[in-house]
Amino acid sequence: MPLYEHVMIARQDLSNTQAEGLIEHFGAVLSDNGGSLVDHEYWGVKTMAYKINKNRKGHYAFLRTDAPASAVQEMERLMRLHDDVMRVLTIKVDEHAEGPSVQMQKRDERDSRRERR
């Protein structure tokens, strides 16, 4: 089955448990349609570059899935209809990266930048 990565932004007025409940809910939608949620990360509340639906901040979540296209389309459709979800980005990948995403790594664990001139 194809592999996908999703980033979801939920409203800022949700609690952390409600935001993580959204991840579980959409994982259940995938499994009902023949897919699976391989891994997920809750990135927390972050400030956005511009307002979306009068919100300056949002709960960010990252999902790695292994699902057929029809399951992903159904999950995206339900995400767009859900009142608490403001934005969704889905990308098809060849393989999932090992370990935590770049957002979850500590700054000293990341590759260092080149030297300044």
Curated annotation (Swiss-Prot):
InterPro entries: Ribosomal_bS6, Ribosomal_bS6_sf, Ribosomal_S6_plastid/chlpt, Transl_elong_EF1B/ribsomal_bS6. Keywords: Ribonucleoprotein, Ribosomal protein, RNA-binding, rRNA-binding. Residues 96-117 are annotated as: Disordered. GO terms for molecular function: small ribosomal subunit rRNA binding; structural constituent of ribosome. It comes from the Bacteria. SUPFAM superfamilies: Ribosomal protein S6. Residues 105-117 have a biased composition (Basic and acidic residues). It holds the Pfam family Ribosomal_S6. One of its GO terms (biological process) is translation. GO terms for cellular component: cytosolic small ribosomal subunit. PANTHER family: MITOCHONDRIAL 28S RIBOSOMAL PROTEIN S6, SMALL RIBOSOMAL SUBUNIT PROTEIN BS6M. Belongs to the bacterial ribosomal protein bS6 family. Binds together with bS18 to 16S ribosomal RNA. HAMAP family: Ribosomal_bS6. This is Small ribosomal subunit protein bS6. It comes from Ruegeria pomeroyi (strain ATCC 700808 / DSM 15171 / DSS-3). The lineage of its organism: Bacteria, Pseudomonadati, Pseudomonadota, Alphaproteobacteria, Rhodobacterales.
